[in-house]
Amino acid sequence: EVIKDPYELAKLGPLAANGAIWIVTRDGYRGGPNVTVDASLTASMASNGDVRMTNANDERNFRAGFYPEGTDLDRYLPAYLKDRTDPMFFGVPGWAEDYYNTPQLQYNVNASVAGGKGIANYLFAIGTATNEGMADNTDYSKYNIDFYLNMMPVKGLTVSTILQATKVSRSRNNTLRDRYAEMEYFPSLSTPLPPTQSGSDTYLSYLDDSKDDNDNIALNGSLALNYLWRALRAGVSVKFDYETDVRNAFWPTTVIESMNFTSNYSAYNRRFIGDFYLGYDIDFTKGHKLSFDLKGAMEEDRFHYNYTRGYDGNDDMHKSTSGGGYKVTNFLDQEVLHFMNSSLNVGYRWRDYLSAGVMFRYDGVTSVHPNHKWLFTPAANLNWNLKHSLMENVSWISDLALFGSWARIGRYLPSDRYGMGPQSTSENIGWSGSWISGSYNQYATATRPYTFGWIGFGVEWPYADKAEWGIRSKWLKNRLSADVSFYSNRDKNLLVKLPVAHEYGYDGQYKQGMEITNRGVELSLAGVLVNQPNDGWQWSVAANFAFNHNELSSLPDGLQQAETDGRLLKVGEAVDRFYVLENNGIYQSDAEVPVKDGRKMTVNGVELKAGDPKWVDKNGDNKITDEDKVLKGHSLPKYTGGFSTQLKFKRFDLGASFFFAAGQSAMNYRAYQQYDFTTLDKGDNLAGVKEIFFWQSGNVPMDYPRYNALSEVHPYRADQDLYLEKVSYLKLRSVTLGYSV
């Protein structure tokens, strides 16, 4: 069950600030069948014939169109595009035969046994699932075992226990980008993987000696005691969640320029929760009822990891850091967060006509500054059933109700470093993600610039003000239903990294005061169009639609805009917009280039010429700079929805479901990588990494302007709307055919 009601989310607290999903379990059977087994098998095929593979000859011909006529291409092309007799690059492409898996199998097998009576019952379940990926020999396997026990040792007292264990193993993809990011080491990127079958086979044979084991084990459970006596109810419970993540990776000398690499990573995340509740109901005359609920909880979250990396071992026989002569570096860290909350909920109900509730809650956390550990978060709701109170005799209306709720919910900060106060924090002498706080041994000087950013005193709780109101209805003896709701979600007091002068030694300053507002509407319709139980026919349909608008409402210190991490945050604009230059084509001649005060338009001091892009000069200074960038498009869809239908005939059923998203855009990174070859071929960075599927056509538009590859203005830079594409879609999510035994 998806929980979206702000009032219900407020009962769960900050962990549900982004929403929550209830997983409802059932008790053990009380008589009747007590053993169940179910299984499913799905096979899918990747159509390799639809992959339009290319080779070096195709790439050479593509690049030739970007140079002036008569240019000696071999002066500018990389080595792998020069020798047309090289069979590895100019031969028939065939890499897709090994890359795409055919067929792919997905299966699930589950079994359970249950039993017992009213005073004691149990449920024991086991299951396994496997999902083979579409490409790169990826797969996923999962094993789980669950045990549920309910007992009533004395009247009114129930004891409930849940134990769940899960193991997940995953075979990762072999992309070069992921490997280089893990190693933090770049070999030469001058030559990509060859596209031919023999070249692909050779590379895969090198990977046969590699290792990339990924295992995740999770164990969680709870013990709850609940007592009910007349109008009094009480309970206490303990819950735990323990998860381990282990990854062992090794890449041999054959794929890293005669150097090997190994890493061992182990981590655990541990959560422990103890909570209680005490409730009492008061019934008045004429159907009026009051309920009081007092709740409290304490929670501890602990995150711990050990990470060891080894470079340049003696040979490829030792695949771990425990031996083999590796140059080893070790990293470890632990973070502990504590949470506490208490709340009082008062509910009111008048028969089936009206219900209302208010909640007063305090949350405390250790990840904010000590002076601001506590946050008060109230909530309220109201439900009015028009059918029961005003329209009892209207037969064609089955149900009609108005509802509304509001809540303030705190948001946990992702780390306790924000509550530590001023710090000189850098990762320049560590590894990516391993932060070092300079405090002695001249670290505060040696680690400049401080890439994490300045944090001052007084970091407080971020929080969200959520509101929802709408109407629920059912018609014609519940055969038709229509629900509509309007919502507002205002995230306030958010941290944002703002730019500061470089002389401070920081690359930014974290400040609170950013506010982001999301508003929208959700509509759902459902109906049973045909219902003939005597003949066994039933046809039902359902549809849903949602619209969302996000907006930056404020920035710290009254700022109206700020540029951070390549994005422009501007008050009154959506936060998911792209910050790009507007591209209006190509200058066909030098005479087309605008001239102001006797000087031609420039880009970083370089004059534009024929064959260069027409970027829009927004501020009219005859210079193309970041000040000419505009906000365009949205990375998140504005409209989402779906449609489903199900046709039943006796024991058979046929169903289909569709999903759509519209109003979003995306930057075609693949096109950028293809067109900006003159820049990316020269640099050793992740943007220049060419995966095996670089040798594939069809994903890159061929109608872009052909700019001069020798231009000094970087014509195919990434931050322009040339690559911005609308990516709305309608997707067939599933088609199912079933038979009930």
Name these PLM-found stretches.
Residues 1, 6-15, 45-49, 438-441:
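N-terminal plug
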Residues 1-3, 12-18, 29-38, 514-519:
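Periplasmic N-terminal gating module of Gram-negative TonB-dependent outer-membrane receptors
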Residues 1-6, 38-44, 51-52, 123-125, ...:
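Periplasmic plug
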Residues 19, 27-136, 174-176, 204-213, ...:
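Residues embedded in well-ordered regular secondary structure
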Residues 36-87, 417-419, 425-430, 434, ...:
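Conserved small-residue
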Residues 85-86, 365, 608, 661-740:
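Extracytoplasmic gating/loop element in the C-terminal half of outer-membrane beta-barrel translocons
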Residues 112, 538-542, 634-662, 717-741:
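Conserved C-terminal beta-signal and adjacent last beta-strands/turns
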Residues 142, 148-167, 197-251, 261-578, ...:
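Extracellular/periplasmic, surface-exposed regions of secreted and cell-surface proteins
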